[in-house]
Each structure stands twice: as C-alpha cells, then as structure tokens.
Amino acid sequence: MNITQQLCCPGAAENQDYIRLGEDIAMVVDGSTPLVKDPRVPEVREYVRLLADAVVGAEGEDLPHMVAAGIETLRRRCGVPPETEGVSAALAILRETGEQVEVFVLGDCAAGVRFRDGRGPELVSQEAVSRLDGAVVAEMCRLHRERGIDVIEARQLPEVREMLLRHRRMMNRPGGYWIAGFAPEAARHGSHRVYRREELSRVVLFSDGFSGQREALLGAEEPCLQELYQQLRQREAADSRCNRYPRLKPGDDVSGIVALF
C-alpha cells in the first residue's frame, strides 16, 4: 500500500487523535476524555500513543488478536483491571500482509473501501457510539427549542450531563458499545474485513471528526483531506453555537489516512 495523504488536526487546544504509520500498517486512534479521572491511567494524549505502539508491536494472527493483545499489554502496564473506567479510544486500522489486506474498526472511527472493479464503495463502521451521541444531540436540540438557549449551552445542563454519564457507563458492556480501553474483550466486537490486495484501489481511514464528510470520503477516487478539512472548519466557524448544525461541541479533532493499492 502507498500512503498518499495523512491529516491529524485538533478541534481544541489538545489534539486527542493520533496517527500511527508503519511499514505494513496504518492506524487512526481517536482518544476520549474520561468523565472521571483515574490516577493509575495515563492522560488521553499519552494513552493513544501507548495504545498504538502496543497494537503495532503485538503478535497476532489478525488485527482483532493484535488489538486485544495491545490492550492487554497496556492494561498490565497500568496495573488496572479490565473494567477500569477512564480513557478510551476508537480505532481504524489497515494492515497489508502479502496479498491480503485487513481493515479493522472499533468504536466511531471508520474506513471507506473502494474496489478496482467499480463495486461499492464499502463503509466499514460501527454505529453504537453514533446512536448514543445522536440521542444526546437530540436532547440538546429539544432544550434549545423549549428554553430558547443555544444548542451548545444545553450541553452544560444537568440533564444532558447525566445523559452523557449514563452513556459512558455503557462502555464495553453488552447492550452498550465497545471501544478500546483496558478490556481486551472489546477487540472481539470490532468490525473486521479481509480483502485480496488485487481487488482494492483505495482505503480511507478516518476519525469521527470527519463523519460529516463520509460521502465525499467514500465517493471520490482520491479525496483531498486538507480541502475537506478546510470546508469543515469553515462550516463550524459560521455556526459556533451549534444551532444550524447541531453537534456535541463546536469542533472535534479530525484525522484521516488515504492508502492506494
């Protein structure tokens, strides 16, 4: 595979996204700030780097096994049980081994796959986190209408904060959502695809900050990440209170990788 583009830009002062590139692997990691801090675990920016290094350095027959091994390595390093609440991260990983190409997604990162024969494109994603976030945004919009406040103001209200906390407690539990934290079992719940190298033309990995550009990322033969990023930031700047384009926060971290075959 040939990595032709990469982008990793912050939505606020601290960028919690991370990109890791290796000889045969590419990885987007989207870290999440814990609602309750645990002194035993690293800060988000350190966690995403440690997790990426642990996954890339893990031994395993496929990406789900490598992700599980990487999470377990990090869990032991921190000396915490699997159910530890704290930092977490969504993943989108691409790995080439000979004539085989794997794509793995966990959480709300995603991958867009295009084929040489024109079929598709195919989106590899998981919707559990997006559904929960969508429910929160819907509640923020309801409060916006009923109380005459900006959508972004509604996030600070007790009922919205409690909703966010309730959703976070569903992490890595049946009926909730699965994401990289400290539970290796989460890797079994990722979306895993295996392709023949010869059938692929392009794969794009992206964090949920790019979710609004899904159609462009999937549809273009080779999307320009920088151009899409600039369009996104312009739209956000024109709607800083989140009233026109309701969302959880004014701007999110944005990451993407384009690989050609």
PLM features: residue spans?
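PP2C/PPM-type serine/threonine phosphatase catalytic domain
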Residues: 1-261
